[in-house]
Amino acid sequence: FFRANLYESNLQGANFEKTNFTSANLTRANFTGASLIEANFQNANLVEANFTSANLTGSRFEGANLNNAKWTDGRLCEAGSIGECK
């Protein structure tokens, strides 16, 4: 999924272990309950993505835009969240 455009995709409950989402457009993607173990989200656009209850163990987010994304614990990432949910 390198550089893929998955804008508003419903990926709920999917298994994406070790998947490469580098530089992908995942704006408003729904990853609720997904298995994303060791997934690579480097430089991905994850604005308003939903990671509620997703497993992100070992996943990489360097340079990823997480503005207003919903994190695994349900909190919203603040504006300016690049590389990590703040």
Name each model-derived stretch.
Residues 1-86:
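Tandem repeat scaffolds
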